[in-house]
Amino acid sequence: MPRVKRGVTARARHKKIIKLAKGYRGRRNNVYRIAKQAVMRAGQYAYRDRRNKKRVFRALWITRINAAVRQHDMTYSVFINGLKKASIELDRKVLADMAVFDKAAFAAIVQQVKAAVAA
């Protein structure tokens, strides 16, 4: 049985890591050992931040809704409670989008919510 040298597989493995580290600064983009650490760290950040992204966007939507609702003399918590009472099933993403881009429709929803809260 012939002897298997590891040069080809090692080269392929190194190329894969160096390719993933493309665009990094300093020795992180061309020194295998450092690039490998940088790529692993980048993967950890990417994994963590894919989850954080959901929290950050929800917080942004809530902030936008709160700001828009306060222009109509209402607080965010009262507004959300009123949405439930009026059985309006719009999520925060859609509400925030309406608050920014379709103020008339958002104002109509606020009026419905005020009626539901008063009743």
UniProtKB/Swiss-Prot annotation:
GO biological process, one term: ribosomal large subunit assembly
CDD domains linked to this entry: Ribosomal_L20 (cd07026)
GO cellular component terms attached to this protein's record: ribonucleoprotein complex; ribosome
Signal sequence region: none
Entry GO MF terms: rRNA binding; structural constituent of ribosome
Family statement: Belongs to the bacterial ribosomal protein bL20 family.
Function comment: Binds directly to 23S ribosomal RNA and is necessary for the in vitro assembly process of the 50S ribosomal subunit. It is not involved in the protein synthesizing functions of that subunit.
Identification of the protein by name: Large ribosomal subunit protein bL20
Organism of derivation: Paraburkholderia xenovorans (strain LB400)
Organismal lineage: Bacteria, Pseudomonadati, Pseudomonadota, Betaproteobacteria, Burkholderiales
Gene name linked to the record: rplT
